[in-house]
Amino acid sequence: MQSLGAVMLTSSSQRNTSSSRTTSDSELLHAKKDEDFDQIFPEALGRLSACHWSPVHVCRTAAQLLVVQPGTRVLDIGCGPGKFCVIGATTTQGHFTGVEQRGKLARTAQEVVKKHHVPRVEIVHGNIQDVNFRDFEAFYLFNPFEENIMPALRIDYDVELEPRLYTEYSAHVQQQLLRMPMATRVVTYCGDGLEIPDCYACVKTAFTDKLKLWVKKHPSPAYTHAAALSADDHRISGGGEDYAFA
């Protein structure tokens, strides 16, 4: 399984946290470098970005893959301080909703959206099990449940982390995706793809296969949680058509 730590773009020691924050809001929101964009967050959260928040170039690519027409409704599962949602809304015409169970991160995301007047973004403080997937057309996942099985990556002690929750949340997402209509789009960044049902095909990849676009191509079988979770080997190793793109 690809770890969050394995995709760290820069170490916190490389991040210039002592530089003067004189860049305009507009420049920050459209920044193409993480060290620039992350200045919209409190410094403590900015230092977590390299490991825990999606890189800017990944956010841009993922948003473009998910938004197929103006107004496409995208759900970011485990949105953290809202980095993907903000970048998605400023680079596409989609509507982005982020769900985050940590209250502090959700509030930070809400404050960023309000302060910078970011359009078409909603941040929800809550658990993924309380979200109605049918309110959305596309989904983004950057290893949202991995902390439960890799305690070294723990952000804080504000929420319960248990290995059983990794399986439980992954199974829940998989079951919700099974119920979605044909042509539903999902982008995953890193992770083992446990949340993706077999009726979805991987149709594009990027960044040495770390980022994958999945599209629902087949009708949903009548899976139970256990059956669905046991049928992922060929899919994770590249089942479906894979096309690398720039």
Task: Briefly describe each language-model feature range.
Residues M1-Q69, T108-D135:
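S-adenosyl-L-methionine
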Residues G71-G80:
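Conserved class I S-adenosyl-L-methionine
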Residues K83-Q93:
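Conserved SAM-binding loop of SAM-dependent methyltransferases across substrates and taxa
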Residues H95-E100:
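Conserved SAM-binding motif I beta-strand of class I
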Residues K104-L105:
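Conserved short alpha-helix immediately C-terminal to the canonical SAM/SAH-binding motif I
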Residues F136-M150:
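Short SAM/SAH-binding signature in class I
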Residues N148-Y223:
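C-terminal substrate-binding/active-site "lid" region of AdoMet-derived donor-dependent transferases
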